[in-house]
Amino acid sequence: YGRGVSRSVPMGDVVEQIAKLVDRGHKEAVLTGVDLTSYGPDLPGKPKLGQLVKAILKHVPDLQRLRLSSIDSVEADEELTEAIATEDRLMPHLHLSLQSGDDLILKRMKRRHLRDDAIRICRDLKKARPELVFGADLIAGFPTESDEAFENSLRLVDECGLSFLHVFPYSPRVGTPAAKMPQVKSDVIKSRAKRLREKGDEVLSAHLTKLVGTIQDVLVERGGLARTKCFTSVHVGDHFEAGSFATVKIAAHDGKRLTI
């Protein structure tokens, strides 16, 4: 709503831009877009996202880390799935645009996947690349969402093995079909969002706990923070220069990030 028609940047232009960034010392690139897995149908030859990923990794050999932003899991093409499973420089973290774990709500959202699709893709990718970590967007209180539908979303967190949640309480936008549907009461929306966030805290803590005691290669950012390959935040203080790589041993976590 209000976004207009998707426009894809030609593959050659993307490769060229990333190559220039690497020449200037950048070590990681992130592919982003409103609907990243819809890349390519407006370009000659209609390349898909998987082809773009492979082209970047092939033609920019000095790029050390490539990430994908939020993707629609069911739209992941075969080459992209293969790259996720086999390309070490494609980081083992995917943020999925799931939105709900209930089929009826997904249909009313006009999503392109159903609940079982999300579970299947997470299961298959995790089997192909065990270190893969998933995050997801979930909306609480979409119009007509029943208690049962909400519980389906809550269960999806474990069934997909999610470690990071972005939870959004639904708010109507004038002119959209959803705004004309029967609305969930605001106090119910707040309560459901709170429960989803609590679930997010739970699975994040479990993910962080698994990493305590491990050795991690991190890319240092500003503010004394760094990121593991699986996008987990690590507090490294002022021990390392921003933009550098470091190998650190994880000592603990504070529920939100790792510490050394």
Map each language-model feature to its residues.
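Canonical Radical SAM [4Fe-4S] cluster-binding loop centered on the CxxxCxxC motif
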Residues: 1-15
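Conserved, mostly hydrophobic/aromatic
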Residues: 14, 31, 68, 96, ...
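Short, acidic/polar
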Residues: 14-18, 81, 147-155
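Non-catalytic positions within long, well-ordered alpha-helices that form the structural scaffold/packing
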Residues: 22-23, 158
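Conserved SAM/AdoMet-binding glycine-rich loop
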Residues: 23-147
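Radical SAM enzyme [4Fe-4S]-AdoMet core and its adjacent flexible, acidic
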Residues: 40-58, 109-112, 172-202
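C-terminal, non-catalytic macromolecule-binding modules
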Residues: 128, 148-193
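Terminal RNA-binding accessory module
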Residues: 172, 180-260
